[in-house]
Amino acid sequence: MKTLVLLSALVLLAFQVQADPIQNTDEETKTEEQPGEDDQAVSVSFGDPEGSSLQEESLRDLVCYCRKRGCKRREHINGTCRKGHLLYMLCCR
């Protein structure tokens, strides 16, 4: 009888250990898909620090974001961004 209880406890423990990584994976995917995490502001600088004043004025108004799923309206793809091993689109307006 004691052996049966011990074996049952071991089987239940094994099932619980296998179930925990699945729950953690679900929680990780939920946190990865948070809105707002898609868009990350980026500071962009181009060219020579002694560039023309016309170029400086046009770049001052340039706002860029690293986006996972493509650019929004009024934005255009201006390259790629890298955060760790992931690549994002650099979208500027």
Swiss-Prot record:
Cystine residue pairs: 64-92, 66-81, 71-91
Isomerase is among the record's keywords: no
Main location: secreted
Gene source species: Mus musculus
Protein known as: Alpha-defensin 15
Family the UniProt entry places it in: Belongs to the alpha-defensin family.
Pro-piece positions: 20-58
Tissues where this protein is expressed: Paneth cells of the small bowel.
Biological-process GO terms, alphabetical: defense response to bacterium
PANTHER family in the cross-refs: ALPHA-DEFENSIN 1, ALPHA-DEFENSIN 1-RELATED
Subcellular location: Secreted
Region (Disordered) residue spans: 23-56
Transmembrane regions: none
InterPro entries, sorted: Alpha-defensin, Alpha-defensin_C, Alpha-defensin_N, Beta/alpha-defensin_C
Signal peptide from the UniProt entry: 1-19
Annotated keywords: Antibiotic, Antimicrobial, Defensin, Disulfide bond, Secreted, Signal
SMART domains: Defensin_propep, DEFSN
GO cellular component, one term: extracellular space
Entries under PROSITE patterns matching the protein: DEFENSIN
General function of this protein: Probably contributes to the antimicrobial barrier function of the small bowel mucosa.
